[in-house]
């Protein structure tokens, strides 16, 4: 039913008194209460707030995707102006009508592209499906349009990418595919739910710029859901702040950042880690915690002087890890991905060494190779004086009690059929460490330490938000009191307050138990806060390594400087350089089988500070 006279001039979407609830054990749990907002054509509205504040369920309610999940949605008004300029009431549309609205008039980019894309269909088939459905195009026409969309989101060799499957693409490429799919029918409204959270800083910067460019080209309204205030400053026109299911403040991006009125807004801004905040400091510092009574409750500046002198707990020498690529009629291995090439470093008890770099630089593969989750083709891995790269599977299992891994994707790390209490309890059972009652008490303690409740132990992974699932994975990794924890983007999906709590927890455990962390991250502000030393990886090799203060305050390698320059800053008035929208700034690390790559030569430029001399300056400085 048209409502053309009920939208204000320029508005493409208007919501009044939105209420969302879920039934749990015959009780109605309110998720969103009396939420009202509007969106103008060509405008970006950022919805910000912590995990559980109601941001994502609001987006799902607009897309009418909550009913099938048991959500109870009530709204006085939910008007959308379609591409045809017809205004419809979304709550009155049937399921069949909504299938035509989704994609054609409203589209959504989800937080986790790997779980949003169908693993059994090629990229081209998935984009073409939306085009055929909404534009009545033939298969051939849809594939031509799919290639054009991949070109539009700046994916090179689009024709080749069309025939690839999601698992064959990097995280940044998969997110661009999601954007191409969402924009393939030129929707009036795009909802982006944390689309850059898991991406490295350079790809994140390109994705943000890409959304702005395409928004201008299509005169599209954008709802951008995020907890990253630096991203908000870079992309938003207006900001809506949510807390416990309610809107507590709304205004222009300048008003929110320069004159916030609500205590929670001030607390959010004060808790944002600022790059450069650790200038002049040698050791990690705790994060300030969000508090409505004390907007940025600063804890005493306790220095983390936790590194133990003596022998390293972990020593890596000339680590090599490669993946075969098959081709030809005989399906022979003809090329190899040189993921990690002759990487060497030491890790001392009580130390945090951070690995930073772009997608495809070899950070995660290095972490996986240390636990033999992927095989290495060369080098030595020595833990507590014992070589572990040659251990039998039985001995390796016992060793994994002392080296634990926190993976990047929390949903894929948890068994959907197990309660989270059982998931945390599993490593204790496998190693036979605690009897039943003591183990249950340990689970309750771990849940509380990571900011959850003991009664959450009886719930399943799908009942938690992405940030909460990551906290569960961290609790499981801490269960065995390991000596080394490899954290692969462990806090990238968390909002600022929970991220601060988790980092502070990791620092407390490091201080109390001498745990060493290999911290893999793209969040340079967090890396600056938590690290004793930092190593920058490029094309599988370490190109700069040294004390955190030296690397951040005096970066020597062009690639390190590029990573630091790409970090979003929580200041909307700051002028940002325009970047070339490339799918990946890295040259290819795929080589013919048997071809050897020259190892970089690290030169000492300061105490403990080593840097490689770039062989080709332009390769590191592309923008």
Swiss-Prot record:
Membrane topology, record value: Peripheral membrane protein
UniProt entry keywords in alphabetical sequence: ATP-binding, Cell inner membrane, Cell membrane, Hydrolase, Membrane, Nucleotide-binding, Repeat, Translocase, Transport
Protein's cellular compartments: Cell inner membrane
Swiss-Prot/TrEMBL catalytic activity: glutathione(out) + ATP + H2O = glutathione(in) + ADP + phosphate + H(+)
Domain ABC transporter: 15-269, 314-564
Description of how the protein assembles with itself and partners: The complex is composed of two ATP-binding proteins (GsiA), two transmembrane proteins (GsiC and GsiD) and a solute-binding protein (GsiB).
Known role: Part of the ABC transporter complex GsiABCD involved in glutathione import. Responsible for energy coupling to the transport system.
Name assigned to this protein: Glutathione import ATP-binding protein GsiA
Originating species: Escherichia coli O1:K1 / APEC
Originating gene: gsiA
């Amino acid at each position: 039913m048209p409502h053309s006279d009920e939208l204000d001039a320029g508005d493409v979407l208007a919501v009044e008194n939105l209420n969302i609830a879920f039934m749990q054990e015959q009780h109605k749990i309110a998720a969103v209460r009396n939420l009202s907002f509007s969106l103008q054509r060509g405008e970006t509205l950022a919805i910000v707030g912590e995990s559980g504040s109601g941001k994502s369920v609001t987006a799902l309610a607009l897309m009418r995707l909550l009913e099938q999940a048991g959500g109870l949605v009530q709204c006085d008004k939910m008007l959308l102006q379609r591409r045809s300029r017809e205004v419809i009431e979304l709550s009155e549309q049937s399921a069949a009508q909504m299938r035509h609205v989704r994609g054609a008039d409203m589209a959504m980019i989800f937080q986790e592209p790997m779980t949003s894309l169908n693993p059994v269909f090629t990229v081209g088939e998935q984009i073409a499906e939306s085009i055929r459905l909404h534009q009545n195009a033939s298969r051939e026409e849809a594939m031509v349009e799919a290639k054009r969309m991949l070109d539009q989101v700046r994916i090179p060799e689009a024709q080749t990418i069309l025939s690839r499957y999601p698992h064959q693409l990097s995280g940044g490429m998969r997110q661009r595919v999601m954007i191409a799919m969402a924009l393939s029918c030129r929707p009036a409204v795009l909802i982006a739910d944390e689309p850059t959270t898991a991406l490295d800083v350079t790809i994140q910067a390109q994705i943000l710029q890409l959304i702005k460019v395409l928004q201008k080209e299509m005169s599209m309204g954008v709802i951008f859901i995020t907890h990253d205030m630096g991203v908000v400053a870079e992309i938003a026109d207006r900001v809506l702040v949510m807390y416990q299911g309610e809107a507590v403040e709304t205004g222009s991006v300048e008003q929110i950042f320069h004159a916030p009125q609500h205590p929670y807004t001030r607390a959010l801004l004060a808790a944002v880690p600022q790059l450069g905040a650790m200038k002049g400091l040698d050791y990690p510092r705790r994060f300030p915690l969000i508090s409505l009574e004390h907007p940025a409750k600063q804890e005493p500046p306790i220095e983390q002087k936790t590194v133990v002198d003596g022998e390293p707990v972990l020593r890596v020498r000339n680590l090599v890890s490669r993946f075969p690529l098959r081709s030809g009629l005989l399906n022979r291995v003809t090329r190899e991905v040189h993921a990690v090439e002759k990487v060497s470093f030491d890790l001392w008890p009580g130390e945090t060494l951070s690995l930073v770099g772009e997608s495809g630089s070899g950070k995660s593969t290095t972490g996986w190779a240390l636990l033999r989750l992927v095989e290495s083709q060369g080098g030595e891995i020595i833990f507590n004086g014992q070589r572990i790269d040659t251990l039998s599977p039985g001995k390796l299992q016992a060793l994994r009690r002392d080296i634990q891994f926190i993976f990047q994707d929390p949903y894929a790390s948890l068994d959907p059929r197990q309660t989270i209490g059982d998931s945390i309890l599993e490593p204790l059972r496998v190693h036979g460490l605690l009897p039943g009652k003591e183990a249950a008490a340990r689970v309750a303690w771990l849940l509380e330490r990571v900011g959850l409740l003991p009664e959450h132990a009886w719930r399943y992974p799908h009942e938690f938000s992405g940030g909460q699932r990551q906290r569960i994975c961290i609790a499981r990794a801490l269960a065995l009191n390991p000596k080394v924890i490899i954290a692969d983007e462990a806090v990238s999906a968390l909002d600022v307050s929970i991220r601060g709590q988790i980092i502070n927890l990791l620092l407390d455990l490091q201080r109390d138990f001498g745990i060493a962390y290999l911290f893999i991250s793209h969040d340079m502000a967090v890396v600056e806060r938590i690290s004793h030393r930092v190593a920058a990886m490029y094309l599988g090799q370490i190109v700069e390594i040294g004390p955190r203060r030296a690397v951040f305050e005096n970066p020597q390698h062009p690639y390190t400087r590029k990573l630091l320059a790409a970090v979003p800053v929580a200041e909307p008035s700051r002028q940002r350089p325009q970047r070339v929208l490339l799918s990946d700034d890295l040259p290819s690390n795929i080589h013919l089988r048997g071809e050897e790559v020259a190892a970089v030569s690290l030169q000492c430029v300061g105490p403990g500070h080593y840097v490689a001399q770039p062989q080709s300056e332009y390769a590191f400085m592309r923008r």
